Amino acid sequence: MCDYKVSERAYAKLIFHAAKYPHQAVNGLLLAEKTSKGSQVEIVDAIPLFHQCLYVTPMAEVALMLIDAHAEREGLVIAGYYAAPENFYDNQVDKTPAAKIADKIQENFKNACFVVVDNKLMTLQHDRAAIQVFNCPGDSGARWSKAKFTLSQASDTLEGVSLLLKRGAMRDLVDFDNHLDNPDKNWTNDFLNQPLNDLQKLY
């Protein structure tokens, strides 16, 4: 059985992506260290994909190749997929867009996870992790089953994300749709890679 640890950086980016487009579905990829710690996969970064056309398209294929190359340079691996459904009440895998992308990732990384943003927990008073994590345990018989996860420095991360949401930090996040509209915009969102405490000084 595999469980997951989600870094503050990865969590902040995927939450900011969902918060930037609250009335649209969004999706993205999750990156992890190449070597897992025992049965734990540590998700260290998130790369926002799309908020317009979320399905497997030529542009999605290009994005996957670019992100794979980026991960390789950073010593990371594509280890998961995240999605925020458009419908407020949908928080299950079968209700999320472009699940085939998650299936494709799982073919290449057997311990891949599928993170679903729980819209009901997406509030400015961010006191609980607004995600559910799923994986494909080989012995369960289920395609995607709920998995255990921990949020790195949970209390500080939730407090920091909450404060940054209130200050509008999500407006500066760049996804691949934004990058395609303006190639000068950086889809790696390097400015979000600093600790949340330091990031708060910018807003």
UniProtKB/Swiss-Prot annotation:
Keywords: Endoplasmic reticulum, Membrane. Residues 4-140 form the MPN domain. One of its GO terms (biological process) is tail-anchored membrane protein insertion into ER membrane. Its main location: endoplasmic reticulum. GO terms for cellular component: EMC complex; endomembrane system. It is a peripheral membrane protein. InterPro entries: EMC8/9 (IPR005366), MPN (IPR037518). Belongs to the EMC8/EMC9 family. Component of the ER membrane protein complex (EMC). Part of the endoplasmic reticulum membrane protein complex (EMC) that enables the energy-independent insertion into endoplasmic reticulum membranes of newly synthesized multi-pass membrane proteins like rhodopsins. This is ER membrane protein complex subunit 8/9 homolog. It comes from Drosophila melanogaster. The lineage of its organism: Eukaryota, Metazoa, Ecdysozoa, Arthropoda, Hexapoda. The gene is EMC8-9.
